[in-house]
From Swiss-Prot:
Annotated organism of origin: Prosthecochloris aestuarii (strain DSM 271 / SK 413)
Gene Ontology terms: cellular component: plasma membrane; proton-transporting ATP synthase complex
Pfam families reported for this sequence: OSCP
Bilayer disposition of the protein: Peripheral membrane protein
Subunit structure: F-type ATPases have 2 components, F(1) - the catalytic core - and F(0) - the membrane proton channel. F(1) has five subunits: alpha(3), beta(3), gamma(1), delta(1), epsilon(1). F(0) has three main subunits: a(1), b(2) and c(10-14). The alpha and beta chains form an alternating ring which encloses part of the gamma chain. F(1) is attached to F(0) by a central stalk formed by the gamma and epsilon chains, while a peripheral stalk is formed by the delta and b chains.
Membership in a protein family: Belongs to the ATPase delta chain family.
Compartments (UniProt record): Cell inner membrane
Keywords of the record: ATP synthesis, Cell inner membrane, Cell membrane, CF(1), Hydrogen ion transport, Ion transport, Membrane, Transport
Protein name: ATP synthase subunit delta
Cited HAMAP family: ATP_synth_delta_bact (MF_01416)
Top-level taxon of the source organism: Bacteria
Gene name of the encoded protein: atpH
Function: F(1)F(0) ATP synthase produces ATP from ADP in the presence of a proton or sodium gradient. F-type ATPases consist of two structural domains, F(1) containing the extramembraneous catalytic core and F(0) containing the membrane proton channel, linked together by a central stalk and a peripheral stalk. During catalysis, ATP synthesis in the catalytic domain of F(1) is coupled via a rotary mechanism of the central stalk subunits to proton translocation.
Gene Ontology MF, one: proton-transporting ATP synthase activity, rotational mechanism
Keyword Cell inner membrane: yes
Length: 180
């Protein structure tokens, strides 16, 4: 089984358990802390990826690092993935968990690049329009793209909506040269 499929399955199982137990917020917080700690610690990354370190040793080490900080369900999850020799996929499982949680709550992440900084009112209108378009709640990441001549580009999952001036000029060029 590929690591992506396994990560998604483990993440889905953890989310199911968290929802059934009513501890989704606590598990969210736990996973954020685990993710940040692993990202900041080269030693933890090496330990998690090492095939020479046994699963129960990895579980004990993680429990020692996060002693008294994690919810019981999160601790059981860590123990499970260590015993199943999947601890090296923990960062991917955290990302899959976040994606599944957002999906289940009807939230979608959108990347908006603009040539100039959008005013607050413009950003609100754009987010409201995207929410109407997608039928979901929108979490927008706004960024400046100095390569754009003007306008905006919006990335929703695998879909790109290109409202940039460059794109409009390219479309105009194609239309004008098609008639010749």
């Amino acid at each position: 089984m590929s690591s992506a499929i396994a990560s998604r399955r483990y993440a889905a199982a953890l989310l199911d358990v968290a929802e059934d137990s009513g501890v989704v917020e606590q598990v969210d917080t736990d996973l954020e802390m685990i993710s940040a700690t692993i990202a900041d610690s080269h030693d933890l990354v090496v330990m998690l990826k090492s095939p020479l370190i046994k699963g129960d040793t990895k579980a004990k080490a993680l429990k020692a690092v996060f002693h008294g900080m994690l919810n019981e369900k999160t601790l059981l999850f860590i123990d499970l993935i260590c015993r199943k020799k999947r601890a090296d996929h923990l960062p991917q499982m955290v990302e899959e968990y976040k994606a599944l949680r957002d999906e289940r709550s009807g939230l979608i992440n959108v990347d908006v690049n603009s040539a100039v900084k959008l005013e607050d009112e413009q950003a609100r209108e754009l987010i409201n329009s995207l929410a109407t378009y997608t039928g979901k709640k929108v979490r927008a990441r706004l960024a400046l793209d100095e390569k754009l001549l003007g306008g905006v580009t919006v990335k929703i999952g695998d879909t790109i909506i290109d409202g940039s001036v460059r794109h409009q000029l390219d479309m105009l060029r194609v239309a004008l040269t098609a008639d010749v």
